[in-house]
UniProtKB/Swiss-Prot annotation:
PANTHER family: 3,4-DIHYDROXY-2-BUTANONE 4-PHOSPHATE SYNTHASE, GTP CYCLOHYDROLASE II-RELATED
GO molecular function, one term: GTP cyclohydrolase II activity
Lineage, top ranks: Bacteria, Pseudomonadati, Pseudomonadota, Gammaproteobacteria, Enterobacterales
CDD domains given in the database record: GTP_cyclohydro2
Enzyme class, UniProt record, top EC level: hydrolase
Catalysed reaction equations from the record: GTP + 4 H2O = 2,5-diamino-6-hydroxy-4-(5-phosphoribosylamino)-pyrimidine + formate + 2 phosphate + 3 H(+)
GO terms of biological process kind: riboflavin biosynthetic process
Source organism of the structure: Shigella dysenteriae serotype 1 (strain Sd197)
Cofactor: Zn(2+)
Subunit record text: Homodimer.
Protein name as annotated: GTP cyclohydrolase-2
Amino acid sequence: MQLKRVVEAKLPTPWGDFLMVGFEELATGHDHVALVYGDISGHTPVLARVHSECLTGDALFSLRCDCGFQLEAALTQIAEEGRGILLYHRQEGRNIGLLNKIRAYALQDQGYDTVEANHQLGFAADERDFTLCADMFKLLGVNEVRLLTNNPKKVEILTEAGINIVERVPLIVGRNPNNEHYLDTKAEKMGHLLNK
């Protein structure tokens, strides 16, 4: 286990009341959060989203990505389902950090795509560690999920880490003229399953 469960509190939202559960990485002290809606106990697979932190999309309403749209759509679907989990995976910019993400944006403004920009900065296309998310699910007592994602690599890594993904639920929202090239690159170079 790479994490410990530290604290929880009620979080009222426009979609209803969630239980916010805080986790801390044992090696680094970095924190992550789960939003739990309804009763996730029992043997029925839970609708879940692993949402990687995106300050620009989630909080600043950026149209460069689909992250903020996905966050809102996931919370809506979880609330409509009556139960579910959103893991807020605190690895900003596919885990290159906020300042490097802004540097990558500057390179994209010069014509590089999102993958090329990461490579120019000395990073892999995706630096995230989804095994942390498997540990969060386990600490919540959940081993079977219906995963809201377009990323088959996320499904693969969580499965290898012991989470049974019984269904991949597409989450295709937020395409606009500002992020079309970004989304096309994620599909073509990173294998994301996106429809136009």
